[in-house]
Amino acid sequence: MSAYPKFDVILKALNLSSVGVIITDPEQKNNPIIFVNTGFENITGYTKEEAIGSNCHFLQGDDTDKEEVAKIRHAINEKSTANVLLKNYRKNGTSFMNELTIEPIYDDNDHLYFVGIQKDVTTEHNYQLELEKSLWEIEKLSTPIVPIKENICVLPLIGSLTHDRFQHMSDYVSEYMDNGKEDYLIMDLSGLADFNEDAVMNLVKFHGFMKLTGVELIITGISPKFAMTLMRYQENLSSLTTYSTIKEALQFY
């Protein structure tokens, strides 16, 4: 008795799977599909009769990520594995996010095939986008830009200026300035919990970034401890305008 399951058992198992399974033959012209399982039909809406003989390109649209498609092409050329996330389209025209893995396999005659395992991760992808959007909104709330006058706004910093927070802050300020007409940005540091070397380096970078935008950066709320740390970077911050308080700064602008 054979230790291996019969072909019809394997086929039945494949068709019971909820993931899509396709097999293509890259040794034929245009690498056509030669097998799809029921999972593929359920995900895409295409029947096996419609899919077999076609290249997988028919699932793509104009907004399918070209870089991800290039990874697939490279893997096929190199006879290697690829893992990609593609925006694909069902037969009814609706889109879905396809988490696709392709693997080269050989039969007993060393004939090359590619097996593709596809999973509809649209729900997970949309959740991730919503999560990122929510985190961005939270970050905006933790980095409030307050308009004071027609051409002046204030950015009060509270807590710690970590690398990640600095990056989010830079992105948010850049977006804000692109849509505004401010000439001056007052950054108030009086609420910062600490001001270490990393925070100073981030401030140096931010100062350079603001100079490129044409918006003058004004720093207020510098404690004596902060001032001592800043002294070591005087060359980089020599053109930086500072005041004790926001109120004092506004007297000059």
Swiss-Prot record:
Role of this protein: Exhibits the same spectroscopical features and blue-light induced photochemistry as plants phototropins, with the reversible formation of a blue-shifted photoproduct, assigned to an FMN-cysteine thiol adduct. Positive regulator in the activation of the general stress transcription factor sigma-B.
InterPro entries, per the entry: Bact_StressResp_Reg, PAC, PAS, PAS-assoc_C, PAS-like_dom_sf, STAS_dom, STAS_dom_sf
Sequence ranges assigned to domain PAS in this UniProt record: 6-79
Keywords recorded for this protein, A-Z: Chromophore, Flavoprotein, FMN, Photoreceptor protein, Receptor, Sensory transduction, Transcription, Transcription regulation
Location of S-4a-FMN cysteine modifications: C56
Post-translational modification remark: FMN binds covalently to cysteine after exposure to blue light and this bond is spontaneously broken in the dark.
Positions of disulphide bridges: none
Protein name: Blue-light photoreceptor
NCBIfam families membership: sensory_box
SUPFAM superfamilies: PYP-like sensor domain (PAS domain), SpoIIaa-like
STAS domain location: 142-253
Gene3D superfamilies: PAS domain (3.30.450.20), STAS domain (3.30.750.24)
Residue ranges constituting the PAC domain according to the UniProt record: 80-133
Gene Ontology molecular function terms on file: photoreceptor activity
